[in-house]
Amino acid sequence: MGDIAKGKKIFVQRCSQCHTVTKEGRHKVGPNLWGLFGRKTGQAEGYSYTQANIEKGITWDEETLNVYLQNPKKYIPGTKMNFAGIRKKRERLDIIAYIKEATSK
């Protein structure tokens, strides 16, 4: 498991421009991530996903999010997430720990 505090710092630097994590958070360029864990791809209510995201059909958990964050466009070709990915596994695990904690309060 990752470090939540480190994950929050990385999230603020690299993810918060496009995503929110609170229950009342709005969609930005990317969807609000509240309730992400256990949800299928392309299912955040009120967000306009690409067909590729909708059809991927995986359920978000630590493992799938880790693979996705390493290289989003490779994992879901056709995603509109304009982000190259996070190479360092430790950073991905920290972000995942933060997202899991922040989106389940």
Swiss-Prot record:
Binds 1 heme c group covalently per subunit. Gene3D superfamilies: Cytochrome c-like domain (1.10.760.10). Pfam families: Cytochrom_C. GO terms for molecular function: electron transfer activity; heme binding; metal ion binding. Heme c binds at C15, C18, H19, M81. Keywords: Electron transport, Heme, Iron, Metal-binding, Mitochondrion, Respiratory chain, Transport. SUPFAM superfamilies: Cytochrome c (SSF46626). It is found in: Mitochondrion intermembrane space. One of its GO terms (cellular component) is mitochondrial intermembrane space. PANTHER family: CYTOCHROME C. Electron carrier protein. The oxidized form of the cytochrome c heme group can accept an electron from the heme group of the cytochrome c1 subunit of cytochrome reductase. Cytochrome c then transfers this electron to the cytochrome oxidase complex, the final protein carrier in the mitochondrial electron-transport chain. Belongs to the cytochrome c family. This is Cytochrome c-a. It comes from Takifugu rubripes (Japanese pufferfish).
